[in-house]
From Swiss-Prot:
Organism: Neisseria meningitidis serogroup C (strain 053442)
Gene Ontology molecular function: any one: FAD binding
NCBIfam families listed in its UniProt record: murB, PRK00046.1, PRK13903.1
Subcellular location: Cytoplasm
Pathway(s) this gene product operates in, as recorded in its UniProt entry: Cell wall biogenesis; peptidoglycan biosynthesis
A single Gene Ontology CC term: cytosol
InterPro entries: FAD-bd_PCMH, FAD-bd_PCMH-like_sf, FAD-bd_PCMH_sub1, FAD-bd_PCMH_sub2, MurB, MurB_C, MurB_C_sf, Oxid_FAD_bind_N
Name of the featured protein: UDP-N-acetylenolpyruvoylglucosamine reductase
């Protein structure tokens, strides 16, 4: 276990690039070190921050508790049968690197989730998703350290209670389970999922008449994302800032009467998912800026750190977007990233 560092700058550890410091900071390189961390005098399970890639947090002020940076690495195959492979990745693995690793192995299932920022450990928490695939579709199980019992436990896919951008780890399990690794069930044969947006056309372009592969899909997703989304290493951001709102069928029908071209996606339960980016774009908010925080000029769903944005700049901008969209569509937007501390959330 690495030594504790005090008054540590967290700017490099959050992709929006908000300036904040941690009172205490420690890097976790091996899951077994959790047993030592929980016995540190600086440890308080009510205030500790388990930090991965920092791509889904907004640090609104200095962090008064202990920050544990998950740096445990490792990928291994644990089972193979009937065209399916179970592959385990440690929580500290960079998500995109892991996806590329599985594609290089000839496995299928994660290619649509290419280039999503963050680490493997965050994928079940947020139930990350893109281009018609969600983490829940490929997660077999999640290995955790249970802070209640101070033991390692394995939670099945069903145990995780996945929903749209939700999971057990954001609800009842928040503050109890520390994710140390995730097991994914991937296919040895390629099963394309090309029904979302312009993905099929891009894959066809890249495959140039031959049979498409998982790598073609991954490359297509990367090309599309790079054309629309800013690189957080160049322009600070947390990816999609708002969740796509889900509304009732009756309300959706009323909106479609007023806006026939509105993108909408009927759900199995009868509700309808809308595109938050389209709603924001219709309010002509692309490029809108408050202080150093701005709506990205090409993708309305992304807020960026354009010029040393303060936490207050980000909050005011997000609040303005929420109010503007609600005033026009009577649809409420909810932020995807976690506000820290939570009292700042809108």
């Amino acid at each position: 276990m690495q030594p504790i560092r005090y008054r540590t700058d967290l700017t490099p550890y959050n992709t929006f690039g908000l300036r904040a410091q941690a009172r205490a900071f420690i890097a976790l390189e091996h899951a077994d070190g959790l047993r030592d961390i929980v016995r540190l005098p600086e440890f308080d399970r009510d205030t500790v921050l388990w930090l991965g890639g920092g791509s889904n947090i907004l640090l609104m002020q200095d962090y008064a508790g202990l920050v544990v940076h998950m740096e445990n690495k490792g990928i291994r195959e644990i089972a193979r049968s009937d065209g399916m492979v179970l592959i385990e990745a440690q929580a500290g693995e960079i998500w995109h690197d892991f996806v590329l690793h599985t594609v290089a192995l000839g496995l299928s299932g994660l290619e649509n989730l290419s280039l999503i920022p963050g680490t493997v450990g965050a994928s079940p928490v947020q139930n990350i998703g893109a281009y018609g695939v969600e983490a829940k579709d490929v997660i077999h199980s999640v290995r955790c350290f249970d802070l209640d019992t101070e033991t390692f436990v394995t939670l099945s896919n069903a145990d995780c209670r996945f929903a749209y951008r939700e999971s057990l780890f954001k609800q009842e399990g928040k503050g109890r389970y520390v994710i140390v690794s995730v097991v994914f069930a991937l296919k040895t044969h390629f099963v394309p999922n090309l029904g979302y947006g312009d993905l099929a056309a891009k894959v066809a372009e890249l495959s140039a008449g031959r049979e498409a592969t998982a790598k073609d899909v991954s490359d297509a997703v990367c090309a599309i994302r790079n054309s629309k989304l800013p690189n957080p290493n160049v322009l600070g951001n947390v990816g999609s800032f708002f969740k796509n709102p889900v509304i009732g069928a009756e309300k959706a029908a009323a909106l479609l009467e007023q806006h026939p071209d509105m993108p909408h996606y009927p759900q199995p339960d009868g509700s309808v998912k809308l595109a938050a980016g389209w709603l924001i774009d219709q309010c002509r908010l692309k490029g809108f800026q408050i202080g150093g925080a701005a709506v990205h000029g090409r993708q309305a769903l992304v807020l960026v750190n354009k010029n040393n944005a303060s936490a207050n700049d980000v909050r005011q901008l997000a609040q303005h977007i929420k109010f503007t969209v609600f005033a026009r569509f009577q649809v409420e937007l909810h932020a995807e990233p976690n506000w820290l501390p939570a009292s700042f959330s809108l």
